[in-house]
Amino acid sequence: MSTKANKYCLDANVLIQAWQKYYNPKFCADYWEILTELGKIGKIFIPELVYEEIIRTDDDLSKWLKGSKIPINKISEPVTVHIRKILENYPLLVDNTKARSLADPWVIAHALHENATIVTKEEKVTALNSNKIKIPNVCDNMGIRWINDFQFIDELDIKFQCSLT
């Protein structure tokens, strides 16, 4: 049985960190072209709140995202039903005092609604005394598949071309 997903829901950190660090379009334009193609065929999507989080900053990533073909999933009634359950059971997922992780429950809710695999840079919190909870913790508890961006690249057999200029 294949573990390959039909759809992938991207967390904001997958795009932000890739743009700022290891897949900067100056030296890895292929990554962004592939994401655009995956968006066109409906293989990937981002929740509306992830989109808003990224375009809030007027930078090159936000400009790219606005012009990309990655579908932006809007908030719907079924998604809000999932949100209520997530926030009831995992109130520490969102840090309201610092306005952090505000899109995280929406990433999970949209993935649930679409039966999609979440792609995130977050890692499980395993410390027993931690007052934080991350997307992978909630996913594991709710039976939602999640992977990091390197697993995503491997799973879709994405290849990059390199050359000297």
Tell where the protein language model's regions lie, with residue ranges.
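PIN-domain endoribonuclease scaffold, especially VapC-family toxins
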Residues: E48-S101
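Short histidine/acidic/glycine/proline-rich micro-motifs that form metal-
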Residues: Y22, Y51-E52, E122-A127
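Acidic, PIN/NYN-like endoribonuclease modules and their adjacent C-terminal/linker elements
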Residues: S2-K4, C28, K124-T165
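Noncatalytic, typically N-terminal accessory segments of nucleic acid-processing enzymes
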Residues: M1-K7, I16-A18, E77, V81, ...
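Short internal beta-strands
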Residues: F45-E48, C139
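Short, well-structured N-terminal submotif of metal-dependent ribonuclease cores
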Residues: M1-I46, E53-K66
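Acidic, metal-associated active-site segment
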Residues: A99-V119, N131-K134, V138
